Design a protein with these regions (language model features):
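Membrane-helix interface segments
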Residues: 4-10, 85-92, 115-119
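Small-polar-interrupted transmembrane alpha-helices in polytopic inner-membrane proteins
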Residues: 14-19, 90-110
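"…centered on the first transmembrane helix and the immediately adjacent amphipathic helix/loop
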Residues: 1-74
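Short, charged juxtamembrane terminal tails flanking transmembrane helices
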Residues: 145-149
């Protein structure tokens, strides 16, 4: 079993708790926050002369799912594979962790008023996490190549 970097494991767990905390916000509060973000993005795009009609509450919510799990993927990979070994004994626990967290997240939402846990969000979350894992390995490879040069 790979050695886990404890400092990064704590940061990773804090990120998971932040995600779960967001899921505990009732639908009205969550929807209000999403609408505020949507209006800010639309206002910015409009001010620079770009099309903004495509930015909807739905798009903002799904991008938030993807982004928070991309960050979690980066952090988890750093915690589970601090040395950049990319071996099965490192990747398997990372993958299980990154599947378990969104599954729990969507289950939490089943019990929060105005929220719904849906499998499509788990899939979006897992895609975000996978993107984070890939980005972390790409960044590590680039940094190692730069040091070697």
């Amino acid at each position: 079993m790979a050695k886990i970097n404890r400092k990064w494991a704590v940061v990773t767990c804090l990120m998971a708790l932040l995600i779960w905390g967001n899921s505990l916000v009732p639908g009205s509060g969550s929807g209000s926050l999403s609408l505020t973000v949507m209006e800010a993005i639309r206002g910015f795009l409009h001010s620079v002369g770009l099309p903004y009609e495509w930015v909807t509450n739905f798009v903002v919510r799904k991008c938030a799912h993807f982004t928070e799990y991309m960050v979690l993927g980066i952090l988890a990979t750093h915690a589970f594979d601090f040395e950049g070994r990319r071996t099965f004994d490192v990747l398997l626990p990372t993958a299980v962790f990154l599947l378990l967290i969104p599954s729990i997240d969507e289950t939490i939402q089943l019990f929060v008023p105005g929220r719904a846990g849906v499998i499509t969000d788990v899939m979006i979350d897992c895609c975000g996490a996978a993107t984070g894992v890939v980005l972390r390995y790409l960044l590590r490879s680039l940094m190692c190549a730069k040091k070697a040069a």
